[in-house]
Structures are given as structure tokens and as C-alpha cells.
Swiss-Prot record:
Residues 23-37, 52-92 form a propeptide. It comes from Octopus vulgaris. Expressed in the posterior salivary gland and more specifically in the mucus-secreting gland cells. The keyword Secreted applies. This is Tachykinin-2. Tachykinins are active peptides which excite neurons, evoke behavioral responses, are potent vasodilators and secretagogues, and contract (directly or indirectly) many smooth muscles. Its main location: secreted. Residues 1-22 form the signal peptide. The keyword Acetylation does not apply. It is found in: Secreted.
Length: 92
């Protein structure tokens, strides 16, 4: 009976020791993990919905791109005439 109690006590002590060292290992691992990996800043992170907004912004910034030109089609006769622009004489 004493041997069984002694064996159970040893198992309990070893279990407590292993659990505490496992917590230390996890804590050390989490600290290392936090220091190595930087979270993305708000300007770096682009969500799934943000990607379509980013693509739309790019198309607006570059209206003469091939994709926009092909979508618009050929210019119509009455749309824009560069000869109609009058130079302003009041520009300093």
C-alpha cells in the first residue's frame, strides 16, 4: 500500500513539473512568435473587399489603359473637340 502511494505521489509530482515546464515553453514560444512576426499595419492589409476597391482606384487613376479603352469603344464625333478649347489670357 505504501509503494502504491509512493508511486502515485511520484507520478503526481512529475505531472505537475511537466505541466509547469510546458507552460514556460508555451510562454517562451509565444514571446518569440510575437517578436518575430509583425502584425500588418492598416495600410498594408487589404481585405477581400478592399482588393476590388483598390483595382477600381487603379482604373480611375489610369483612364487610358487598354482595359478602359476597349470598354469605352471608339470616340464619337460630337463628344470632344480639342479645337474648342480657348486659351485663357488671365493666367499669371
Amino acid at each position: 500500500m505504501i509503494r502504491v502511494g509512493l508511486i502515485l505521489c511520484c507520478i503526481f509530482i512529475v505531472g505537475v513539473f511537466e505541466a509547469s515546464s510546458a507552460d514556460d515553453i508555451l510562454t517562451a514560444h509565444n514571446l518569440i512568435k510575437r517578436s518575430e512576426v509583425k502584425p500588418p499595419s492598416s495600410s498594408e492589409f487589404v481585405g477581400l473587399m478592399g482588393r476590388s476597391e483598390e483595382l477600381t482606384r487603379r482604373l480611375i487613376q489610369h483612364p487610358g489603359s487598354m482595359s478602359e479603352t476597349s470598354k469605352r469603344g471608339p470616340p464619337k464625333k460630337g463628344d470632344f473637340n480639342p479645337n474648342e478649347l480657348k486659351p485663357e489670357s488671365n493666367i499669371c
